[in-house]
Each structure stands twice: as C-alpha cells, then as structure tokens.
Amino acid sequence: MTSSVAFAPIFHLRKQAEAFAGTRIEDVVMGRPVHFVDDDAEVDARAEAKLGETAREAGFTNVKFQFEPIAAALSFEHTLDRDELVFIADIGGGTADFSVVEVGPKRRLMADRTGDILANDGIRVGGTNLDMRLSMAAVMPHLGSKSKTKTNRDLPRWPFVDLATWHRIHTLATSRNMTTFKQILADCADPVPFERYVEVIRRQGGHAIAGRIEQAKIDLSSTDTIIVDLTEAVPGFRVRATKRLFERAIAVELERLSGAIAATLQASGRKASDITTLFLTGGTSAVPAVKQVLSTLLPNARATEGDLFNSVGFGLALEAKRRFAPTKAVRRAT
C-alpha cells in the first residue's frame, strides 16, 4: 500500500464516481500544475510519476495528465460562440499557473489541440504564501517577532516563520523546541509578546491562527480594515489588519507573479494587445492586488472569472470525455 497522502482522496473519488456511474472506472485525467517544483525538471517528472503511481494503486489503470490552466481553458471554451486568444490565470492555494491558448467553438471539436497551446508557465506562489506573509506582518509582531533580547539582538526568526506556515505548524510543539522557547523567553528584554507565542504553542493554537488569517485575506478583498479575532488560539488575542499592510507584505509574491505572467506572454510569441480575454480561476485570483498585476500587464483583455474553485475540474471532465468517451461504452447507473 502506498504511503502517499494522495491515496485516500483519490481512492475515495474513484469509489464515489463508480457508485454514481454504476460501472467500474479505469480511466482518469488528472490535473497537475505546470510545475510541481520550480526550475527542476527532474524533480517535477518524479512528482508526476509518483502521482500517477498513486492513482494506479487507487484502482485506475489508464492515467493521463493535463495542465490545470489548460483544463481551465477548456472549461471557458465550452461557453464560447467565437474564437478568442485567452490568457488563463489559475492561481490557487499553492501554485500560480499561466497559459496562452487559442479557443473557440470549432477548435473544441479538434482531436489534437497541441497547436492551440501557445505557452505554459507556472511558479509556486499561491494563497498559502500570501497567508504566511499576512501572518508575519499582522500577527507575529504581537508574538515577539520584532522583540529584542536583553543585549538588543533580534530573536531567532524561524519560530515565527514556522508558525506562519501552515504545513510547519505541527512541527513546533516538541519537547526540544519548548526547551528552546523557554531559553528565548528568558533572554527577552520584554517577555510579554513571546510569552503569548509560547502559550499559542502550548494550546496548539497555530492552526486556528492560520484559519483566521486565511479568512482575513479574503475579507481584505472587500474592506480596508479588519479586526482578526484570534481568541481561539489565545484568550483575548485580537489584531488589526489593513489592506495596505497586506499588499505591502505580499510585494515579493506580486513581483514574482508579474515576472511569470510576462514570461508566459513572451513565450507565446504574442503581444499583450493580442490577448482578447483574461480568464481567472483559482481562489487567489480574486485577491484585488493580484487582479491589478494581471490587468496592468494585459490592459486590453476582457477579464472574466470562471467558477473559481470548479473550472479546472469541469475542464478535466471535458478532457476525459474527449480522450476516452469515443472508445468506451459506459453503462449508466439505474
């Protein structure tokens, strides 16, 4: 049995799909980011191979992959009555993927769409990166990240980065770390903020903070100032966050997104003025600062949002239909 964390959800989805269809399902088209890992083709290939192996262990025998932004393009194409040159921006929780694709009602009938895909690119920037930056800017100073030692040195940075990074939170509450935290606390010129940090760890409140920060990021899309209630992590703990603070905090990520967008456009061989539509999908594409980066680089494109969380899935279903339906006789559930 595989040790991959992806096995259980893939197996569950296959069983659910078979129950719905009333037949065994052996074929699958799985979405993948353009790059699992930035700038490392070998590791990227291993990641896809591992995911394919896990899918086969979960019961699929014929496993194919499609880039997630291409799946989003297929979803958008399904709604069109004319040809368009589309820039697809699929920015989710962990990755930002971009494609330039020619789409249209006649093109969707073609068996081979390779020539319609003018460029693909992607980077590992997504919602979790923005969450981490917001947490570091709005929450961690209240837990000691800006505090000094009795000799006026900065506190170590890693405890705060790990607490702000959702997949690192569970690593903090070890006896070794708690000993280290006590030593840091004893050396603090003002111990109060770091005492609060230690309390968060003792109460296992890190994931509560992460959840509240994710919601704060969403709320700051529609309001300028919010109070983030962190009392689930520490009683009475609340912090103020502003849109301006958030946008300053994510400046590095915005710059990386800008570079990847420009690189994708350059690779396509087309000018920004040639793009007729900017199609947005993935929850992070709804962040106003992210939208602003896209609209600045593609000023003439008509921006349209798909289903932010389901466009890729629908496009993968269309791709599976194109690849498998002509050769498979599917028995409908009764």
What are these regions (language model features)?
Residues 19-23, 144-148, 215-226, 263, ...:
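Intrinsically disordered or highly flexible coil/loop and linker segments, enriched in small
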Residues 102-232:
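Phosphate-binding glycine-rich/basic clefts of nucleotide- and phosphate-handling proteins
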Residues 23-24, 80, 91-95, 207, ...:
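Short flexible coil/turn linkers enriched for glycine and charged/polar residues
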Residues 88-97, 126-128, 213, 282-284:
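A short acidic Gly-Thr/Ser loop motif
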Residues 30, 96, 173-183, 281-286:
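Core structural elements
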Residues 136-140, 144, 296, 300, ...:
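Short, well-ordered loop/turn and helix-capping segments at boundaries between secondary-structure elements
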Residues 82-91, 145, 321-334:
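A polyampholytic, Gly/Pro-enriched intrinsically disordered region
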Residues 1-87, 104-123, 238-268, 277-279, ...:
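N-terminal phosphate-binding loop and flanking beta/alpha elements of the actin-like ATPase fold
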